Amino acid sequence: MTNTTAAIVFHNYPQSPVAEKVRVAFGIKTLSWQDVEIPRLPPKPMLTALTGGYRRTPVMQIGADIYCDSQCIIHELERRYPTPSYMPTSDAGLMWCLSRYTDGEMFTLTVKLILGSAGDTLPEDFAQDRGRLYLGEDWADGLKRANEQLPHLVSQLRAPLSWINAQLSDGRAFLLGSAPAAIDAQIYYAVWFIRGRWSGGPSMLSEFPDLMRWEENVRALGHGTSKPMSADAAIALAKSSIPTSAIGVAENEPQGLETGMLVSISPDLDGGEQPVSGNVRYADANTISIERSSDEVGQICVHFPRAGYRVTVA
């Protein structure tokens, strides 16, 4: 049985938009969490010791269970803390489908707009790291194209922002009604990023009064209650714990995975990232969990979403 009272440890940094998504998710459920601040740029040795090489932000840790990707994190928070629900209506499946757009195309447009508008003012190391992560191997050309296509990128973002504004035009407090939902956090983080990191953001967002009203409602949810924690303490917590998550492989597994099988996992795009290897502990349509061990962190279990990640049998 999962221990829902175990401490939530959140590895993040303040400027991360994807971490902001999860911080808002903490606020929706008024959760308490331990805040481990990680570097904005690699190397991130204390983080990758826990994840087996995954370097993206954020990562959630509960004992020796390590959750990578905000999709996986929000699923697990809902499972452990079902009230209040991230899915207050009967549209949970539809909202998860919509989140694939907000986390995919919509966020990619936002990144291109922000990186492209910054142009040569970006620090070289930051431009190279984020460019490679989001724009592929030819990231320098990608940044140049983004800069040249700024009006087009703005037009592509204004469309979904106008849809969101229309959804809120009946005066509802949140996207699905009177109660906040995961999809509020999954859209808000892009708006937060646009407002905070693009000089034209406040002006563009001002075109959408209902969206701005909603933005204030989401901001007022807060981030739950956090206390700082050192990376060393997080490592020690993992080493003194054992994984408590489920074991097994669901029926109709399309890749023929079995418990104990050695696999590697990586984002299903070319971001130049190191795959994470381990032995299958659990797999179903939504999640894959692998076991790893090292002298530094002991026995751990690293969890990833199935959607958006490639699993390769070793």
Per-segment meaning from a language model:
Residues 224-259:
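Mixed-charge, Lys/Arg-rich low-complexity intrinsically disordered regions
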Residues 268-272:
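Short, charged beta-turn/beta-strand-edge "cap" motif at the junction between a beta-strand
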Residues 102-220:
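GST-like fold's C-terminal all-alpha helical module
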Residues 180-182, 257-260:
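Short gly/pro-enriched beta-turn/loop segments at secondary-structure junctions
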